[in-house]
């Protein structure tokens, strides 16, 4: 099992000309800063190839999603870490933006595709499938607060968790919710649907 250290990326947009910057033939400058931690944990769960976690939501009636923004089928899922430094503080996940991100709703696009875990999870076939109408997937904190996809780690506001010390190191269970959500202004398709999102562990 390999060890992973993930950056917490912060981006700042400079909106006005600044006298300390050289004159450039453009409308502005984007400054990107970040930090790489040498404090690492081992991802214990999911332990599968590429750490793919499959969250199976219950089969529900389309009538459970009558109104825009309605959620149903909320299902908890865990990402477990072990062999973390004992002095490490609270951790959380950052859900990465990507092809499955709906930047308008802050949710994950649902595709009419059956996920085949036994086939080593070929995710490229998911995002190339037909998009489902009227329904997406939502991630949330345990209190139901929407974790908005396609935003920075501060705006995303994923819940943090403290670790448990065992035999001189810490272990963590990072727990969140996944559910169906009614997409605005569309009737809900009845279909087998799938989506996915990458995650990074945010270190203090």
Curated annotation (Swiss-Prot):
It comes from the Bacteria. One of its GO terms (biological process) is cell adhesion involved in single-species biofilm formation. The keyword Flavoprotein does not apply. Keywords: Disulfide bond, Fimbrium, Signal. Residues 1-25 form the signal peptide. SUPFAM superfamilies: Bacterial adhesins (SSF49401). It is found in: Fimbrium. GO terms for cellular component: pilus. Disulfide bonds join 41-84. Bordetella pertussis is the causative agent of whooping cough. An essential step in the disease process is the attachment of the bacteria to the ciliated epithelium of the respiratory tract, enabling the organism to resist normal host-clearance mechanisms. It is unclear which bacterial cell surface component are responsible for adherence but the fimbriae of B.pertussis are prime candidates for being involved in this process. Belongs to the fimbrial protein family. This is Serotype 3 fimbrial subunit. It comes from Bordetella pertussis (strain Tohama I / ATCC BAA-589 / NCTC 13251). The lineage of its organism: Bacteria, Pseudomonadati, Pseudomonadota, Betaproteobacteria, Burkholderiales.
